[in-house]
Amino acid sequence: MDTEYIRSHIRTIPDFPETGIQFKDITPLLLDTKANELTLSALQKPFDTFTIDKVVGLESRGFLFGPSLAAKFQAGFVPARKKGKLPYKTIQKEYGLEYGKDILEMHTDAINPGDKVIIHDDLLATGGTAKAATELVLELGGQVVGYSFIIELSFLSGKNQLLKEIPSHSIIQY
């Protein structure tokens, strides 16, 4: 089964980046051509019938599959980055983390009014970053039509932070 092949290429690193965290490392997916292709296909499939104008990739591991996913949809790729990393005019949204707050930014010209957008990241944990990205897309006049994740940590209930009426897909759940 494709999902199991993908799962077999995600390794858990205990106590990284701090004690008690079980870090899900997706870099083995990038080393194996078959795992890479299966992951990209699994990310695309739930949205095959959708019209997609942009894929927003969340810093930083959303940049690994995000551009390829955008290319599959013949859509543009939009990097959503932490404050101070984008060179042009930006809008920003503050969001909460388990250990504090951060700020997510997008270029002001990245989303056009009416653009249909998928928000993509490698992992859905608490949902704070995806929620901030959603708010930025909406502020620029875009329409979020889907959420795309490789991994979902279901026990953290991150989906509760996302727009309820919008489909959210993750390949692997822990």
Predicted segments with their positions:
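PRPP-associated nucleotide enzymes
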Residues: 1-174
